[in-house]
Design a protein with these regions (language model features):
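Non-catalytic accessory segments of hydrolases
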Residues: 2-5, 9-193
Length: 195
């Protein structure tokens, strides 16, 4: 992964590069951080920890094609390349369709296969190239019927402050994640395969 600060502005994208109906946002290079991943370039934000140190947030990173239409009950299909040159990963996206663990209301969207990454450093820019950081991947609870990995409920601050890279993952829930009908070609356990 190549990481660097971006110093020049790029045009706003009508859908955040997802082809999924997100709204356009102005690109502010002073507040956003650009990184390169296998699928293309993404930009996130720089924030401050309670101790005043900076950390970097990349939210709403799609890790599989939207599980809609023919992919609704299928195993996750990796994204080979993003649809735009620079993907906006500065905000959390929709969680997978399920029940809110607190209000019990139905929330989210079928298109919810996103992850969030919070890191105290950006590799070669902030640390020696041979420095590796511990990584914690968090899969939310909720009985496979509700919940999400958004930072509003599970704050990554303490772990990031201790030098840990934190990744939170949304996965398919309920019937969309765990329906099994072999005779209809639905293998089942898509929610576990998302993980």
């Amino acid at each position: 992964m190549v990481m660097r600060n971006v110093r020049k502005p790029y045009p706003a994208m009508s859908d955040g590069g997802l082809g999924r109906g997100s709204t356009a946002q102005e690109y502010d290079p002073s507040a956003r951080i650009m990184v390169k991943v296998v699928q293309g370039s993404i930009y996130g934000t720089k924030d401050r920890l309670p101790n005043g140190k900076p950390y970097y947030c990349f939210k709403g990173i799609p890790y599989a094609k939207a599980p809609v239409g023919k992919l609704r009950f299928a195993s996750p299909v990796p994204i080979e390349k993003y649809a735009v040159s620079y993907l906006d990963c500065s905000r959390e996206r929709s969680s997978c369709l399920g029940r809110d663990v607190i209000t019990r209301e139905i929330t989210g969207s079928e298109d919810g296969l996103f992850l969030n990454v919070y890191t105290p450093g950006l590799g070669r820019v902030d640390q020696p190239a041979d420095t590796l950081l511990p990584v914690m991947v968090f899969f939310h609870g909720g009985g496979m019927t509700g919940g999400n990995g958004d930072s509003g409920m599970y704050l990554p601050d303490y772990l990031v402050q201790e030098g840990v890279v934190v990744a939170t993952v949304n996965y398919r829930l309920g019937v969309l994640g765990f329906l099994c009908l072999p005779q209809a070609g639905i293998e089942g356990n898509a929610g576990l395969k998302d993980q």
